[in-house]
Amino acid sequence: MNSRTGPPHAESRWPVALVIIAVLFLLEALPEQVRLLPKWVVYVIGFAVLIPIGAVGLTAARARWLHVERKVTLLFFLVAGILTVANLVNLIRGILGRSAEMDGLQLLASSTGVWVTNVLMFSMLYWQIDRGGPEARMNGTSARPDWFFPQEGAPAKAVLLAWQPTFIDYLYLGYSTATSLSTTDTVPLTSRAKLLMMLESAIALVTIVVVASRAVNILAS
């Protein structure tokens, strides 16, 4: 694909920053018996991720900060993913052990937090890895796509000129994957995209079927 001429274009980072803050809030708000790490660790992780993201916006996507942002974002996904799975395992252990420490409302709130965190962290990962990252997409230097969006096959009059997916598109991809548990309007093209969507769907399925359903049963009894 031919690159665009002129100064490089940078995608807005405020939606990503809001998502990171939301993930940190959800991880911090979990009950003590579910949370894996102390609160201060969550805050340290948050600042470590938000600093390079803010620097990318302030420096007009300077290459050095883009590199740091990509590494830190992928590390954040890894840490948040491990915490999410660990929190889910703790919830299931509490259910199987019939722990009296959590009532139905706490269990429902915790399962909702795990489900939303799952959606948000996978959305960030999809946004960061597809076609080489956001700036590669914005400037026409993107690599092989991992997903095919419906706008790419739509008539020219139906979409904006030189349309490229932004974070909101990947947020919707993450949400639809977790709700439908399958492919919707956006099609995975690579093996890693399919495996990641399978993993997200599996976490969402366990959260809904095992944890949330048990919470509803407790509240109804």
Language model regions located:
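N-terminal membrane topogenic signal
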Residues: 4-18
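Pore-domain transmembrane helices of cation channels
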Residues: 96-135
